[in-house]
UniProtKB/Swiss-Prot annotation:
SS bond partners: 43-108
Keyword ATP-binding attributed: no
Annotated signal sequence range: 1-20
Positions of region (Complementarity-determining-2): 70-76
Source organism of the structure: Mus musculus (Mouse)
Gene Ontology annotations for the cellular component aspect, listed alphabetically: immunoglobulin complex
GO biological process assignments: adaptive immune response
Region spans: Framework-3: 77-108
Other comment: There appears to be two possible splice junctions at the 3' end of the intron. The alternate would code for a protein lacking residues 17-19.
Annotated region described as Complementarity-determining-3, given as residue ranges: 109-115
Keyword terms: Adaptive immunity, Disulfide bond, Immunity, Immunoglobulin, Signal
Protein's name according to its UniProt entry: Immunoglobulin kappa variable 5-48
Length: 115
């Protein structure tokens, strides 16, 4: 019997510690999927930030790579299977038809306010 290979996609949490900062909460923390599936990651802000959210991918021992800027704007050179949506406090990063090269940490970053 041949089994479908599975792999893990890990999310990294970005949680500012200073009082008054915008808190971002990502979910799920760990996700196991099969190649070809669609996956979605959520990022929730503690207060409205318009569309000032950016999504990054970081592979093991690699540098962060910007995937989506301002919630839904695509980046040149990033495969079209990556897409973003949302505004205000709720944002989503989706990957259509996941590939093995997508094994990585994914995280959101806000640019509405800085410490």
């Amino acid at each position: 019997m041949v089994s479908t290979p599975q792999f893990l996609v890990f999310l990294l949490f970005w949680i500012p510690a200073s009082r008054g900062d915008i808190l971002l909460t990502q979910s799920p923390a760990i996700l196991s999927v099969s190649p070809g599936e669609r996956v979605s990651f959520s990022c929730r802000a503690s207060q409205s930030i318009g569309t000032s959210i950016h999504w990054y991918q970081q592979r093991t021992n690699g540098s962060p790579r910007l995937l989506i800027k301002y919630a839904s704007e695509s980046i040149s050179g990033i495969p079209s299977r990556f897409s973003g949506s949302g505004s205000g406090t709720d944002f989503t990063l989706s990957i259509n038809s996941v590939e093995s090269e997508d094994i990585a940490d994914y995280y959101c970053q806000q640019s509405n306010s800085w410490p």
